[in-house]
């Protein structure tokens, strides 16, 4: 899951968390499975069953799929781009297994996690939980503290997921002595995608790009030797700068420097060095409309040949794959972000269940399915991510994802992403985004941004 919008905090999170605390203390009683009118959304589902139960008691539906008493309501942010085809495939696969279950899958808004998180927090604060919702695990779950269901016995232990999921994903799905989430897929973050025709025209050998300096030299060569913009960048929201800066920091100063930063021991000199390199890129080598476009528009510039390269998570592959005229190893190719060879920058999407669940048995059946081979293959192939199960046959994935899956299981280091909820708390992540949003969207104030980043992780 990835963010698309122009702002990173459109809700009063403190107000909602206060309400959550009150609700948790009161047992969050009296909730229902409705609430679809609280936000603009796109709904899908089979429409079977009762249309959602308002009974406060636990449901008694069979987890074998023989009978169900309540509607399964799932919120997600995959409203378009890389995610729409993936979640559609996931829903279709689930409904094939449970055709008699009444389901309601809602894509919330067009701004992915921002609107989604606002809706989830509002629903939980109003004692109106949904069955499940898509979200990042790890420290991101702190925003929902006190309102999460424990799936350990009914899902994790019952299905043996602790033995079949990658251990890092298992740990990320633990929170406050519970396991409220099941991972659905992983995106690799440290990617550099490029248009092969543009690189060939400029005389760039992608395999030679082994450092940030080498990348900068290549961007300058493209700028001088072609009419193509060297790099597509999307700055309609600050997370893209934060994400790219993290790759540069790791490339220049190593995984240890990045780890020290997210753990609250930043090396300011390393922070500044990475910002200087990012400033060079943003001032000289990106499209003129970068401040107003999303990553999907930026990715289209690489497809059309208007931009030579782009750094993004491999959700961009999901977008590339949807274009039959833009093929891997032909029109486009990939390398690890220069200087991060042997590293898998770790991102995880998961499905989370809230407590006082309005459809307990249906939710358990759904969460079990999310962790199954069938679900993980159906979802990840179109998404551009890879399954987190360790027993997947790579031949069931596309060639690019089979390669990524091998890297997922056999890399030297797995630093967690700072821009997508795993590495730091929501408060710290928000402060890091604000550091870029306030100081690094043009003009690019290195010193002020460095001060704000250091302060964000040092509090």
Swiss-Prot record:
Signal peptide start and end residues: none
Similarity comment text for this entry: Belongs to the bacterial solute-binding protein 1 family.
GO cellular component, one term: plasma membrane
Gene3D superfamilies: Periplasmic binding protein-like II
Phylogenetic classification of the source organism: Archaea, Methanobacteriati, Methanobacteriota, Stenosarchaea group, Halobacteria
Localization per Swiss-Prot or TrEMBL: Cell membrane
Lipid bilayer topology: Single-pass membrane protein
Domain of life the protein comes from: Archaea
Role of this protein: Part of the ABC transporter complex XacGHIJK involved in the uptake of xylose and arabinose.
Region (Disordered): 27-68
Subunit comment: The complex is composed of two ATP-binding proteins (XacJ and XacK), two transmembrane proteins (XacH and XacI) and a solute-binding protein (XacG).
Knockout or disruption consequences: Deletion mutant shows decreased growth rate on arabinose or xylose. It cannot grow on low concentrations of arabinose or xylose.
Gene: xacG
Organism: Haloferax volcanii (strain ATCC 29605 / DSM 3757 / JCM 8879 / NBRC 14742 / NCIMB 2012 / VKM B-1768 / DS2) (Halobacterium volcanii)
Keywords: Cell membrane, Membrane, Plasmid, Sugar transport, Transmembrane, Transmembrane helix, Transport
Induction, as annotated: Transcriptionally up-regulated by both L-arabinose and D-xylose via the pentose-specific regulator XacR.
Protein name: Xylose/arabinose-binding protein XacG
Pfam families, per database record: SBP_bac_1
Transmembrane regions listed in the UniProt entry: 19-36
Record-linked SUPFAM superfamilies: Periplasmic binding protein-like II
